[in-house]
């Protein structure tokens, strides 16, 4: 049973003799939300950029931040991550990038990113915590752009949309 819980949480059972069990994080998934961990997300991003350059497809990243003036507990983060998983397509890479920051990598243009983001936000306004809000931004990959400049441009988009 412990082994199954560890696998679901993104951990690997290292040793399990008697009542003493130790777990190690697998580095691929966030232990709380079961979404992709940042290193795994950035590796997927690099692969998708290479694929986009070869196949001339559109690639867009959406960055979502959960905001609240009150403390956010683990249950809220888990339900937020579950809603991300259920609101976006199966083939979209979804990750927890920071404490309250999430990233979604989609194959599609900005119109699709806007449509999927609005659908997610409307569902969170119904199902989510009343004291929390969601900010988001998206950026479409430009051919020949490096992964770091792509992510930096996404950060700039979020700053332009925010109130700071």
What are these regions (language model features)?
Residues 51, 86-91, 120-131:
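Short catalytic/binding micro-motifs of nucleotide second-messenger systems
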Residues 14-22, 59-62, 90-93:
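Short low-complexity stretches enriched in small and charged residues
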Residues 60, 96, 100-107, 129-157:
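A short glycine-enriched loop-to-beta-strand structural element that forms part of the catalytic core
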Residues 1-31:
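Short, low-complexity N-terminal regulatory "tails/caps" that precede and couple sensory modules
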Residues 66-70, 141-144:
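Short, internal active-site loops enriched in acidic
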Residues 28-30, 34-49, 53-61, 67-86, ...:
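Conserved long alpha-helical elements within nucleotide-processing catalytic cores of c-di-GMP signaling
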